[in-house]
Each structure stands twice: as C-alpha cells, then as structure tokens.
Amino acid sequence: MTKTAVITGGTGGMGMATARILGTDHRIVLADLNQERIDAAVVDLRASGIDASGTVCDITDRASVDKLLAFAEAGDHHIRAVVHTAGVSPQMGSAQFVARINAIGTVNVTEAFLARATEGDALVNVASVAGHGLPKILVPSGAFPKAESDPVAFEKIIVRRSRVFGKKLHSGLAYSFSKAFVIWYSRKQAAAFGARGARIVSVSPGSFDTAMGKLEADHGASDLLKVSALKRFGKPEEIAAVLAFCASEAPGYLTGTDILVDGGTRAGQEFKKS
C-alpha cells in the first residue's frame, strides 16, 4: 500500500514547496480549484521524479472533499497525511467569503480525513500569525462551535463582528477570526484524532514570499516586517519544511498544538510594547 500525501491549495507556492519535500517518500495528490494549474503542477513534480497526480476540489463543499480523498485512495493507496494549505487572504474577497473558505473549508477537510484516519496518520491545517494576539474580547470564540453545527450562523456572526471597525478592515478582521478558529479547532479535534492513533496540528505562517503573501504585502502587511526579528519575508521552502515535518512520522508525539512560523513577528510586537 503506497503512502499518499494530499495537499490542498496544492498549486500555490506553499503547497508546491511542501509537495517537493513530501514527494521524496510519498505519492502526492494535489487539490486546487483550477484543473489547468493542477495539470501544470503535476507535470512539474513528475519532472523531478515525484509520483504526483491531482484533482479539482472545492473545500467549501463536503461532497467535493470526500471525492478528493476517494480519488487519493483509489488503487489501494493509503492517505498518510493531509496538508491543508488552501485558503484566502483579506484582499481576495468579502468577510463572508473569507470565513467560509478558511473556517468552513477547514471543518470539511478535517471531518472528511478524520473519518478515514488510522494509526500514524496526520493532518496539518494552515492557520496564520493573524490568528494570534487579538484581544480576547474582540474574538467571537463563543461562536466557533457553530462552524460545525450551523455554518450559516457561524458566518453571520463572523461578518457581524468584523464590522466593529471601518469597512476597509472587514475582510481583514474576518481573516484573523477565521485563522483563530483554525487554531482553536485543530486543538479541539486532537482527542478525536488521538482516539484513532492519528495526529492533528496547525501551523501559523507569518509573511511569506508567495503570490498570496505578495498580494497582502502590497496592502500593508509588509509593515509587520519592520517589527519582526528577521526583517524579511519567509521563503516558501522554509514554511514547507515545517509543514512536511509535521506531516511526517517523525514527530509522533506532536498533536493538538499550533506552531508559529513568523520570523519573530509576534515576539517583536510583544517586546516592542514592553
């Protein structure tokens, strides 16, 4: 039975960099929204000697996620790891759109993989530095459980809370809330994964040199670099190394936690105040 790693958002900079690392000892299945981009990414990986394939998946549709995992399992393949990098940033849509993709999409991927997970399997959810450091009074954490039971109500609460500041900040706040949710939800699901002998973690990137990272940098996110310890954008390979390690069998005791990979941004913010 061949070990398989599924990577959502697989054609992006983070996804491809992770595929190159995991592809040394895993069969790779890429998932994204555009088949042409998937096909091009698969050709690229195969040229490097990686056993790769891919299929379209809409993570906001649970049936589409189930179809993705069935595709990955076809032919007696076992999904050893899922690295869930798919998501959107504030500049890519409305507050509701951001909440749906980042939060509800994560629920769908997590629940679908949990139903299949066995001893030694791992799920790595990508959160964000934006999910850290928000005032607790601002984060609608009481609504987080609704993402599982009533996603429509969850989205409405996120959108409503994102309106506490000016319109320009609506999507940004929704993004921060959605990523705080990913961190919370990945911790919440640790026991369920553990009951199957499997692991779940979240990883929170800071500012990275990817298409999405550049988009946000052009709209003010680059200001965070001024307070960071390293004073530069992270390289896709640097975050991929962490994602691939978490997805591998090496950190067998690592679960139910978040790993912050932000070049010292949060540390800089904290100690700048002191």
Q: Which role does the model predict for each range below?
A:
Residues 88-92, 122-195, 207:
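Catalytic loop of short-chain dehydrogenase/reductase
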Residues 194, 199, 254-256:
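Short, small/polar-rich loop/turn modules that mediate ligand/substrate recognition or access, typified
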Residues 132, 204-215:
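Short, flexible catalytic-loop segment of classical short-chain dehydrogenase/reductase
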Residues 255-274:
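Short C-terminal tail/terminal secondary-structure segment
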Residues 11-12:
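Conserved glycine-rich cofactor-binding loop
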Residues 108, 174-175, 180-183, 202, ...:
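C-terminal helical subdomain
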Residues 25-40:
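Conserved glycine-rich Rossmann-like NAD(P)H-binding loop of the short-chain dehydrogenase/reductase
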Residues 56-67, 103-106:
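The beta1-alpha1 cofactor-binding region of Rossmann-like NAD(H)/NADP(H)-dependent oxidoreductases
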